[in-house]
């Protein structure tokens, strides 16, 4: 479980454009075990590779009207660990659209 470079696409519908940015995020493997065979009544907590700390960076999205805030702030991981996925701040599913999805025109 470690920091890795990733390209993500930021989208602001009011501006009609998407922008690709480089960032760091956490990826990799965490130790897991399945005790169901030996102890079916005991459930194990499985760790996932997630961030310990993030900072926020801001980019200006082009093509925004004058009455629209053109700035978009996004998280960038600065440290990773194996732990519980916090569904309050993270999409813990595997059904996300992916970091390069854009429903608008891309710059």
UniProtKB/Swiss-Prot annotation:
Q: Which CDD domains match?
A: GHB_like
Q: Which SUPFAM superfamilies match?
A: Cystine-knot cytokines
Write down the glycosylated positions.
Answer: 5, 22
Which keywords, in A-to-Z order, does the entry hold?
Answer: Disulfide bond, Glycoprotein, Hormone, Secreted
Primary location class: secreted
Q: Which cysteines are joined by disulfide bonds?
A: 1-49, 15-64, 18-102, 26-80, 30-82, 85-92
The answer to whether keyword Glycoprotein applies is yes
What are its GO biological-process terms?
A: estradiol secretion; follicle-stimulating hormone signaling pathway; G protein-coupled receptor signaling pathway; regulation of signaling receptor activity
Report the GO molecular function annotations.
Answer: follicle-stimulating hormone activity
Q: What does this protein do?
A: Together with the alpha chain CGA constitutes follitropin, the follicle-stimulating hormone, and provides its biological specificity to the hormone heterodimer. Binds FSHR, a G protein-coupled receptor, on target cells to activate downstream signaling pathways. Follitropin is involved in follicle development and spermatogenesis in reproductive organs.
Protein name, entry field? Follitropin subunit beta
Organism equals Aquarana catesbeiana
- Quick one: which gene encodes this? fshb
């Amino acid at each position: 479980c470690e920091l890795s470079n990733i390209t993500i696409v930021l989208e602001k519908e009011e501006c009609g454009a998407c922008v690709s940015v480089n960032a760091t995020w956490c990826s990799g493997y965490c130790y897991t075990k399945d005790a169901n065979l030996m102890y079916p009544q005991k459930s194990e907590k499985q760790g996932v590779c997630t961030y310990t700390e993030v900072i926020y960076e801001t980019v200006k999205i082009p093509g925004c009207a004058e009455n629209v805030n053109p700035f978009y702030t996004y998280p960038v991981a600065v440290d990773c660990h194996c732990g519980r996925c916090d569904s309050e701040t993270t999409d813990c599913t595997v059904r996300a659209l992916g970091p390069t999805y854009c429903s608008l025109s891309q710059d």
